[in-house]
Amino acid sequence: MSMKNLSLISACLLLGACGSTPAPLDSGLAAPSQWRYLAAGRSDASDIRQWWKAFGAPELDSLLQRALLNSQDLGAAVARVRQAQASAVIAGAPLLPELNATLGASRQKLLRDSGYSGTDATSDNDAVDSFSAGLSASYEVDFWGGRQAAYRSALESLKASEYDRATVELTLLSGVANSYLQVLALREQQRIARLNLDNAEHVLRLVETRHAAGSATALEVAQQSSLVASQRKQLPLLEQQAHEALITLATLIGEPVQALQVAERPFDSLRWPETGAGLPSELLSRRPDIANAEAQLAAAQADVQVARAALFPKLTLSASLSSGANRAADTFRNPYYNLGANLLAPIFNHGRLRAERDRSLARQEELLETYRKAILTAFADTERSLNSIDGLDRQLHWQQQELEQAQRAFDLSDSRYQAGAETLLTVLETQRTLYAAQDAAVQLRLARLQASVGLYKALGGGWQSDRQGLARKD
């Protein structure tokens, strides 16, 4: 092979770098300067990479570790990452020449007559052996950057799959935390319901004693008996809900519910941390779903370049070095080479290539809107969590007073009734008020704990992107 031919091939290979990488698309969204519903004194965002430890429940840490090991959703996301890795290797392969080796042997033998012009065997030599060996290389010159763009698209898709795995993990962790809190809250409601049932039965015994003595009516006995029955009905309902929460937790962890044991723990021992939200502009690098949408958009942008490159001619270079003989020992004694170039230009394809380009452009526009929505959704999630925390904190202040006064009212009405200074109707009313206040206190505390989980999730759960967001931060 002459130096002239080598220079020609090298020049063609260098021309493959002609395709340029387009600039990233701008979402056109500006991050707000501050959060609207952030309570005073909570502006700084601390390190929340292990946010679940802040609740003070060591068992939750163990459950989350089991979920990371056993979750089918997370396992499927990891498998999708491996698929994307393989796709990136496949897409990058055409950027380099393809090299193949061949080694062959054949025998041609006439069965009768003298053969014809298409056969090597003749009546004089009715059996012909042939041996060959060779190396061949081919390369499509990437004049228009289509191959490079396809590789870039595959790399962005790989990043998107990795960010998707992080999103699945964040959703899994928050789901396990919420289910665990739900289990403990329902157990607390069961405990309170049993105490209330004991209390209601105590009052019923008192009413029955007074009725036997003639100081209470049958109506009062029936009224208190109805309240006792209502409290008894509440227990199996709460037990059913607790079992359902346990089943949900087991499913998230990836284990059968028979294998899951959640230890008894006082619900009021759980605490919620004081977590800031940082600046809105910082959120863009904390949310894996935003990074996923950004990577998908970048992949679609590269696909547009691929579709545009397909409209232009393709140049394929080929080279081979071969040798052959009629005897195996002489196979490598007759070397020769071939050089070739093939230019393929689309002329008429009934608009297919232009339609593919238009489809890629439409897909890019779709993903740009999806990316914008992901940014706005992230802002909305955080604002919603901050608003929820602020409102629940204020409710908890008054809920505590409501519970204290409801307990005091019941104690007073009960003692006055036993002294004959109050009617049973008042006792019944204060009982119902106390039960409702106790139940509301548990539900409000659960809502506050889950609001903290929601804020951690909205902030990305400590995840940090290694790339710059596309949204404007001015």
UniProtKB/Swiss-Prot annotation:
Keyword Membrane included in the entry's annotation: yes
Disrupted gene: phenotype observed: Mutant shows reduction of extracellular PVD levels and accumulates PVD in the periplasm. Mutant lacking PvdRT-OpmQ secretes PVD and can import ferri-PVD, but has an approximately 20-fold increase in the amount of PVD present in the periplasm. The pvdRT-opmQ deletion mutant also accumulates newly synthesized PVD in the periplasm. Mutant accumulates unwanted PVD-metal complexes.
Main localization category: membrane
Region forming the signal peptide: 1-17
Domain of life: Bacteria
InterPro entries: OMF (IPR050737), OMP_efflux (IPR003423), RND_efflux_OM_lipoprot_NodT (IPR010131)
Pfam families in alphabetical order: OEP (PF02321)
Quaternary structure note: Part of the tripartite efflux system PvdRT-OpmQ, which is composed of an inner membrane component with both ATPase and permease domains, PvdT, a periplasmic membrane fusion protein, PvdR, and an outer membrane component, OpmQ.
Family classification: Belongs to the outer membrane factor (OMF) (TC 1.B.17) family.
Biological role: Part of the tripartite efflux system PvdRT-OpmQ required for the secretion into the extracellular milieu of the siderophore pyoverdine (PVD), which is involved in iron acquisition. The system is responsible for export of newly synthesized PVD after the final steps of biosynthesis have taken place in the periplasm. It is also responsible for recycling of PVD after internalization of ferri-PVD into the periplasm by the outer-membrane receptor FpvA and release of iron from PVD, thus making PVD available for new cycles of iron uptake.
Name under which the protein is recorded: Pyoverdine export outer membrane protein OpmQ
Organism: Pseudomonas aeruginosa (strain ATCC 15692 / DSM 22644 / CIP 104116 / JCM 14847 / LMG 12228 / 1C / PRS 101 / PAO1)
Lineage, highest ranks first: Bacteria, Pseudomonadati, Pseudomonadota, Gammaproteobacteria, Pseudomonadales
